[in-house]
Amino acid sequence: MNGAELKAILKDGGRVFGTMLSLSRNPRWLPVLDGVGLDYAVIDTEHGARSRGELGDFLTMMNTTGVVPIVRIPIPDSHYVTMAMAAGAQGILAPYCETVDEVKEVIGAAKWRPLKGDAVRRVVETGEHVSEATKAFLEERNKNSIAIIGIESVAAVKNLEAILDVPGIDGIFVGPNDMSISLGFPDQYDRPEYQSTVKHVIDTCEARGIACLVHHQNPELSSYWINQGARFILHGTDRRALTEGFRTEFTELRKVADDLPK
């Protein structure tokens, strides 16, 4: 799958499945992701420790698989967008966006690279292009580019309709930890206030034909939000998969050993 194919699935009302890679730095193991049921993976550079060179190697290897690489950039800034895309990302996730101006900057860099300055501002704000030839060239060049906007605070939710008016958004990301903290109930995901807020985000986005990602760590919570309408499904992390895999298997092995005669 590539970015254009992933976007087409979402546009048709389908679902795609992915995970977050926050711990891994060595790209040699990435080909195994091709057969585990992932459509995409988000490489976390907001919280994960990777150099620019390491990210480039990571993306080069991931692009040999059928898993679409999306980079979560540190902040909603055009410099980080273009840096990730130039390194080989087929999409970006811009965290903690609260204003229309932030979103316009991200979309301009993700969808119309390498256009800059006043030219990209006019494209994003008015749809005015330098020429039809330039428009066609940039659309073809960036056809795989995926732009995901992070809605992770009360302020962002209040501004959601205006943010969604910016053309070019392919997905809206809800970060449960940040959102619950902003609501005043850190990590209390069963609170009605949290659930109603996230449901409002999903419903508002779906009314515009935009799919949502709600990133939870356990299958029960991820399943809940799939049932509530999340279609851009983002579940778990490499760290959790490693931890839970070891815990499950070594618990089983210790039980076998404990059952043996002393």
Predicted regions located by residue number:
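C-terminal alpha-helical cap/extension of soluble enzyme domains
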Residues: 77, 118-130, 145, 151-158, ...
